Design a protein with these regions (language model features):
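Alpha-helical transmembrane segments of multi-pass membrane proteins
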Residues: 16-32
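Central hydrophobic cores of alpha-helical transmembrane segments in multi-pass inner-membrane proteins
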Residues: 48-59
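Membrane-helix interface motif
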Residues: 30-31, 89-97, 173-181
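Transmembrane alpha-helix/helix-exit interface in multi-pass inner-membrane proteins
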Residues: 80-97, 122-130, 163
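Helix-boundary and loop/linker segments of multi-pass membrane transporters
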Residues: 4-5, 103-108, 144-149, 183-188
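Alpha-helical transmembrane segments and their cytosolic interface
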Residues: 144-157, 164-171, 176, 186-220
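N-terminal membrane topogenic signal
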Residues: 1-14
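Membrane-interface interhelical connector segments
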Residues: 89-113
């Protein structure tokens, strides 16, 4: 990918859209027909969309540098807050059709604990991702500049560790605290299953996006 402003803006756009959509669909739980601790694994609907954001910051960091990657994270946070406020504002406006309003509330209703969980997990995991990505990258390249071919190391290491932070924080806050599952011993296995299931999915997605990362960061 050429280091141009247009390409950088394109990646910012993909990052922002993926982030906002992930927050819209995060309340949906996907049932996976795999048993873990006697429970079906349940995945928040945001898992796939949100995984794209880590790929975008990694590409930005590799091509444009750490500063631009951090700028992307900060603008992403602002986008999340603005999107949430606009959804809440629109939700409060009087509706012509009551039934349509109920459908709207069901689809886009903002549970405050989900918002807190999402913002907390986002800021912590994305900041860690950028930090670790460049920490490992700089250390490996300092030994030998030709090690750029090994960029799968810092790409996967940063994403896979940051996804642990994101998964534990979001599920712990949104479902553990929000639904009160942390204080219900019967739901502990469900929480653990959600964490493990979601992380395994993110782990697989992180591994699968490696060829895309190489393609987008290759030097012609």
């Amino acid at each position: 990918m050429k280091k141009t402003n247009n390409n950088l803006l394109l990646l910012y756009m993909i990052f922002g859209v993926s982030l906002v959509i992930a927050n819209v669909v995060t309340g949906k739980l996907i049932d996976v027909p795999i048993n873990l601790f006697g429970q079906h694994i349940q995945l928040p609907g945001a898992a796939v969309c949100y995984a794209i954001t880590f790929l975008m910051t990694d590409v930005i960091g590799e091509v444009w540098g750490k500063k631009e990657a951090n700028v992307c994270v900060r603008w992403g946070l602002i986008s999340q807050v603005l999107a949430t406020l606009m959804i809440i504002f629109t939700q409060k406006l009087p509706a012509v059709d009551f039934k349509m309003q109920e459908s709207y509330d069901m689809l886009l209703g903002q549970n405050w604990i989900f918002v807190v969980g999402s913002l907390t997990a986002y800021l912590a995991s994305q900041s860690w991702d950028v930090f670790v990505f460049h920490k490992i990258r700089d250390k490996i390249l300092a030994k030998d500049p030709n090690n750029a071919k090994k960029r799968w190391i810092w790409n996967n290491a940063s994403t896979m560790t940051s996804q642990i932070i994101d998964t534990v924080l979001f599920i712990g806050i949104a479902f553990g605290i929000g639904f009160g599952w942390l204080w219900d011993s019967n739901m502990h296995k469900v929480l653990l299953g959600m964490c493990i299931g979601q992380y395994l999915l993110k782990f697989i997605l992180a591994a699968l996006d490696t060829p895309i990362f190489y393609l987008m960061t290759r030097k012609k």
